[in-house]
Regions:
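Juxtamembrane extracytosolic/periplasmic "stalk" immediately C-terminal to the first targeting helix
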Residues: 4-13
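Charged, solvent-exposed interaction patches on well-folded alpha/beta domains
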Residues: 1-5, 18-32, 39-43, 47, ...
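Short coil/turn linker and secondary-structure boundary residues
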Residues: 12-15, 36
Length: 205
């Protein structure tokens, strides 16, 4: 029985082909070719950061080709001086060598997060509409005794939203965002921690 001869990866720029191949359950010259399940390989590759879609093909002589369609970074932050990067699907990884630092600096930075709350925030953030994501410049984790998941979202125009991680997806829909901004365009602080959004004028703080 023949084994996989060669695995090639194309279409990746943010991650290297070598990194993807190293993480695969399929190994060249070790895995039997007939055991390779294309869908299973695609699923495994799509669990990796910056991979939106993977397409796997096999030829008749034992080679496997993987075509990658990448997505983009969405957030980054430091935890214990280690860079963490999240993509648009909510997958995140440590980047101890900071190989992505120049790429992710255009994304909103998360500050004061531990890994648990970093994970939960990213999961909620990627579900926000793009009109909201595109306005956010930085996120600060500010828990207190009353609100253990309180976050401050700083927008590009100087406005500030206060939200809880677990409520953020429901509160910051496109409709709610436009309604609040259009109703109170000159306000700076928008507090979503209560049942209704509390808005505070620029000159009152």
């Amino acid at each position: 029985m023949s084994k996989v001869k060669k695995i090639t990866v194309s279409g990746c720029h943010l991650t290297s082909a070598e990194e993807i191949i190293e993480r695969l359950p399929v190994k060249s010259k070790k895995t039997y070719f007939f055991k390779v399940n294309k869908k299973q390989v695609e699923t495994e590759v799509e669990k990796m950061i910056f991979v939106e879609k993977a397409t796997v093909t096999k030829d008749l002589i034992g080679n496997i080709k993987i075509r990658i369609k990448e997505n983009n970074a969405s957030l980054y932050g430091y935890i214990n001086n280690i860079l963490y990067v999240a993509d648009q699907d909510g997958i995140f990884e440590q980047d101890q060598q900071q190989k992505w630092i120049s790429y992710v600096q255009r994304c909103p930075q998360m500050m004061n997060f531990d890994e648990e709350h970093f994970r939960s925030f990213v999961k909620a953030y990627v579900k926000l509409p793009s009109v909201v994501q595109n306005q956010i410049s930085s996120i600060v984790f500010e828990p207190d005794e009353k609100d253990q998941t309180k976050c401050k979202l700083e927008l590009d125009d100087g406005k500030v939203f206060y939200v809880r991680i677990e409520d953020m997806e429901k509160q910051l829909t496109s409709t709610n965002y436009y309604l609040v901004i259009q109703s109170y365009p000159d306000y700076k602080y928008y507090d979503y921690l209560g049942k209704k959004c509390l808005c505070i004028q620029l000159n009152s703080v």
